[in-house]
Amino acid sequence: MGPAARLAALLAVLAFRAGDPAEVAARGDTFSALTSVARALAPERRLLGLLRRYLRGEEARLRDLTRFYHKVLSLHEDSATPVSNPLLAFTLIKRLQSDWKNVVHSLEASENIRALKDGYERVEQDLPAFEDLEGAARALMRLQDVYMLNVKGLARGVFQRVTGSAVTDLYSPRRLFSLTGDDCFQVGKVAYDMGDYYHAIPWLEEAVSLFRGSYGEWKTEDEASLEDALDHLAFAYFQAGNVLCALNLSREFLLYSPDNKRVARNVLKYEKLLAESPNQAVAETVMQRPNVPHLQTRDTYEGLCQTLGSQPTHYRIPSLYCSYETSSSPYLLLQPVRKEVIHLEPYVVLYHDFVSDAEAQTIRGLAEPWLQRSVVASGEKQLPVEYRISKSAWLKDTVDPVLVTLDHRIAALTGLDVQPPYAEYLQVVNYGIGGHYEPHFDHATSPSSPLYRMNSGNRVATFMIYLSSVEAGGATAFIYGNFSVPVVKNAALFWWNLHRSGEGDGDTLHAACPVLVGDKWVANKWIHEYGQEFRRPCSSRPED
């Protein structure tokens, strides 16, 4: 019951108590005698008491709404508050999907509040869906795993890798942005609902800790409470085999909600289990991270993502070098490109400053209105999957002169025909919160792949341009080559996907590491076999 409804109910009770027939009959002539006027002071004092309680409740509610207003306003006024920070991005989605809804629907239907509700309902369809909140929560878990981040540190806004007793700062934000108990609860609950107690427990533990520290403080936007966090954490521990923790948390729950029969029954069940198996009280619960069936190279992949600049150097391998490249092309004679040979097997080259800031911005601007969830080939179909989180758009070279210039530059450097149907249109990709693409090949590995629909053979080469910089993460990791290339703004990576025999090069298995902090954009130009017969002649030797 809201403040206005409570006031109405209290006034109704007061009217009922003052409803003696004799008093009712005399109300119309109170003014006729001073003694009657004096008697009217008593009920007014009661009304004042009721109004005082109502105003105190309203003041508390308005103070809380003012707190929420200034909290959100400060984020919008601070120009140094980027959504490239995954914690800020998660809380933005949570605010729009959950917090604002709780704030708006907690208010009473007075005229000004009705206008607020109507305005909220008009924009509601444009707000993130619950699935977005789930996706953002899974992204935080992904970053937690790949970069070995400490949940307690994340809750404080700190990006730290914890290995044993060693703590490494991976990124130092200009402004710390901490998570609330409700934020941590939402992340933990997403894992909890998936039966993933490995991730659920540390997030729910942090939620419990934060809720304990602020117990009794009412926040309009919160969806969860200390009791919710204790309840979920207790069951998560029970499912993980730690009955003692489940029992202690359930007992704590009953301190705040002693009438909850379900939790009371759980306490009896846990006590019985411990009585029957005393060893469970001292046994340590070893939590194992959920296995990813399709990712057999997880440890190598994550190790490369954690190691910035893990490619070999010229000092260790003399055959790696840097040069100014013209590829004997008149187009590049007066403007050679800075070339860095990153690796030999597979052959991977990085071309520095391949595009200008203006060109990169133009390409991003052309693609942005057309971005859609990225898909991968699955048999003859193309489907969105959890192991590729990004949006992409395809741009024809006729869209803008910048794309024509780009094609000429790629052709001059590679010596390949990049015009359709011998190459695909430019694919522009923007990675989301914790955006990544787990280990994969660019070339088709199945005859039924949709790549063959172009009737121009397989993808012989990849030309990938970094259209932005990132503050942390996002490297391109070559799994079997055992090296990674960090994001270098405006640079381009080139590698061959196929041997000259037409067989796929297994060493080109690569991945886009999750973006830890930043807004990662890349552009891919995939060049096919057909049309390259005289530009890259075939060979029967497997090593070519």
Swiss-Prot record:
Its cofactor is Fe(2+); L-ascorbate. N-glycosylation plays no role in the catalytic activity. It holds the Pfam family P4Ha_N. GO terms for molecular function: iron ion binding; L-ascorbic acid binding; procollagen-proline 4-dioxygenase activity. TPR repeats lie at residues 227-260. One of its GO terms (biological process) is collagen fibril organization. One of its GO terms (cellular component) is endoplasmic reticulum lumen. The keyword Cell cycle does not apply. Binds 1 Fe(2+) ion per subunit. Belongs to the P4HA family. This is Prolyl 4-hydroxylase subunit alpha-3. The gene is P4HA3.
